[in-house]
Amino acid sequence: MATYKKRGFKPKDKDEEKRLEEQESTTAEVFSSLDQGASRTEEWVSTNQNYILGFIGVIAVGLLGYLAYDQFVQKPKDIGAANELYYPQQYFDLALNATTEKDSLFNLALNGAEGKYGFLDIIEEYPGTKAANLANYAAGMAYLSMQKYQEAITHLGNFSSDDEMLGAMAKGGLGDAFMQLGQPSDALGYYENAFEFSNNQYTTPRFLYKAGVTALELKQNAKALQYFQRIKDDFATADEARTIDAFIGMAKSGK
């Protein structure tokens, strides 16, 4: 720290004078070191400014490259994929509402026809797009309906969404697939994921019910009772609540 003399200050004796001279010398050395450090920094920047500017340039080019990719590659890719989704979606909707030939319609939705892409083509040709993500959901549900459970697990497992309905339905679909494959423990985990995913009047009581029934099968009666009781308490108007008292009785009796 610098030492300053007051105006008119005189040292009391020689020892005091010597001490002041030493302080002034130390202060001068500190400022000299700071000046040398600043000079070395300026010298380094001057010597390496091409490197520094080049490094900044690399960052700028990378950022511009990302923005250009998003604007000129990813966005057009998303638009193209979304346009392709229209054709298989029509067959998927028809299959859901059909009473006969469901599998034929689902196959058209999956594989396409008349030169048009199906869901599987969109997944392969437009990876990373929102349309490909939705195509995974639709393909998984189609395979589930066609009783091709491993394929259903693959595609539903590749789907991700924050949507409270689609996200829950995908988790529940995985539960259904594992249940059909004779893996109730795995199924229960996905049913629990499904009703925990969001809280609404449709998917929550549906998967609480499936989780409860599966828990009964696994002899986890306390857990089953908890799920059935929640339906009774929180979703009294849901379809699943109509016979819930009987299931509550089964869970309590241990049957």
State what each model feature region is:
Residues Y51, E124-A132, M146, S160-A168, ...:
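Short solvent-exposed coil/turn linkers within tandem alpha-helical repeat scaffolds
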Residues Y4, L120-D176:
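Structured, soluble extracytoplasmic/luminal domains of envelope-associated proteins
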